[in-house]
């Protein structure tokens, strides 16, 4: 395509998409029983991560790459905010459960679901709900933190628009 097209030009990207598609298509031939769901979702997560890796290692840092990164960062920020929201309003709706072992287990699971358990433990050590929320929402270095994602989306938006930083 032309310079304004958002294309998938790298054969490695097409190969990864095709492999992922075939893998997911084969899954519908099998019944997705509860004991197989973990493997199925791990396969989806790994396929997505592999595509992101191939994309980042093969695409020029042009408008198409920035557009894809901006979308990925907005989706990631949305996912993380939904995870935190779910913990506050669904998993532990009773205030007297706050600080109990089940609360701490849920916060640990929340970190794991955002692929942040080990990074959190390196930074803060023990599980503390305030620090977990701070880490997942405000951290500048964790790639799934809402703030980090929005900073990267804004960087790409500036690259795409050509507008100087601080103008919107």
Where are these regions (language model features)?
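Alpha-helical transmembrane segments and their helix-helix packing motifs
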Residues: 1-168
């Amino acid at each position: 395509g032309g310079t304004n097209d958002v294309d998938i030009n790298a054969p490695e990207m097409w190969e990864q998409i095709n492999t992922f598609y075939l893998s997911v298509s084969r899954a519908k031939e099998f019944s997705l029983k509860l004991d197989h769901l973990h493997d199925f979702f791990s396969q989806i997560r790994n396929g997505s991560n592999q595509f992101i890796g191939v994309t980042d290692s093969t695409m020029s840092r042009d408008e198409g790459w920035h557009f894809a990164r901006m979308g990925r960062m907005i989706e990631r920020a949305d996912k993380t905010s939904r995870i935190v929201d779910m913990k506050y309003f669904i998993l532990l709706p009773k205030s007297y459960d706050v600080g109990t072992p089940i609360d701490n287990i849920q916060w640990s699971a929340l970190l794991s679901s955002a692929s942040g358990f080990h990074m959190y433990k390196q930074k803060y050590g023990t599980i503390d709900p305030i620090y977990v929320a701070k880490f997942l929402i405000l951290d500048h270095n964790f790639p799934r933190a809402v703030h980090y994602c929005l900073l990267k989306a804004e960087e790409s938006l500036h690259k795409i628009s050509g507008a100087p930083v601080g103008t919107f």
